[in-house]
């Protein structure tokens, strides 16, 4: 019992430290303000459930964003804290050091502006070497997050260890897209595809599953 209590306390302080740091960098929305009033009990309850293997995603609330048009399914505030803690504790230490150096998403010190700098430098080099006798290949995967295979995601995430994987399994199975092309092609497993856009676990799952393609493009440029 003392061991369980100690683990629960450690989890609480980990969540609390992350929450304090989050307040320094995030705008205080109405949802965040309401959470702050009950933050101690909310974080204690989350820590208790994680320690006992009973934590579950509380659900998502959808909203539309534009340019490009898409639906974001955001987790509730407590879940956002837990999922950020989970990503930083379990996913990033395992996968971040192995990502291709030109993978710019979800990583401190990188992002779209650094990506544009790399693209600009590459284009300048191509102009210098070949004039205008070259081309740029830009691609997008249609419906990528809506059609991510839960099975494939779980397989690669087993690398994070048993404790982290138990949490990840609950996250990935908390959401599905039944009318995506992947689910429609697999009618016996309609709940096995799709990941909510806009969550940290989904973003990291997305870049990890595609990272092999980055290396393939580098190693076989022709």
Give the residues covered by each predicted segment:
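Non-catalytic, well-ordered alpha-helical scaffold segments
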Residues: 40, 44, 79-84, 88, ...
């Amino acid at each position: 019992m003392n061991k369980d209590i100690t683990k629960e306390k450690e989890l609480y302080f980990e969540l609390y430290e992350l929450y304090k740091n989050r307040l320094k960098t995030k705008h205080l929305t109405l949802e965040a303000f309401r959470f702050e009033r009950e933050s101690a009990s909310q974080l204690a309850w989350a820590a208790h459930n994680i320690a006992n293997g009973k934590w579950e995603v509380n659900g998502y609330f959808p909203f539309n964003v534009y340019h490009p048009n898409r639906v974001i399914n955001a987790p509730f505030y407590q879940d956002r804290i837990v999922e950020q803690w989970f990503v930083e504790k379990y996913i990033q230490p395992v996968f971040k050091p192995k990502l291709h150096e030109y993978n710019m998403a979800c990583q401190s010190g990188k992002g779209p502006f650094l990506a544009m700098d790399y693209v600009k430098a590459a284009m300048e080099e191509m102009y210098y070497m070949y004039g205008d006798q070259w081309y740029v290949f830009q691609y997008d995967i249609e419906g990528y997050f809506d059609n991510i295979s839960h099975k494939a995601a779980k397989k690669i995430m087993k690398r994070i260890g048993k404790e982290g994987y138990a949490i990840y399994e609950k996250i990935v199975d908390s959401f599905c897209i039944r009318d995506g092309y992947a689910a429609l092609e697999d009618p016996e497993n309609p709940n096995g595809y799709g990941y909510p856009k806009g969550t940290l676990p989904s973003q990291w799952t997305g870049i990890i599953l595609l990272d092999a393609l980055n290396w393939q493009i580098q190693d076989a440029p022709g």
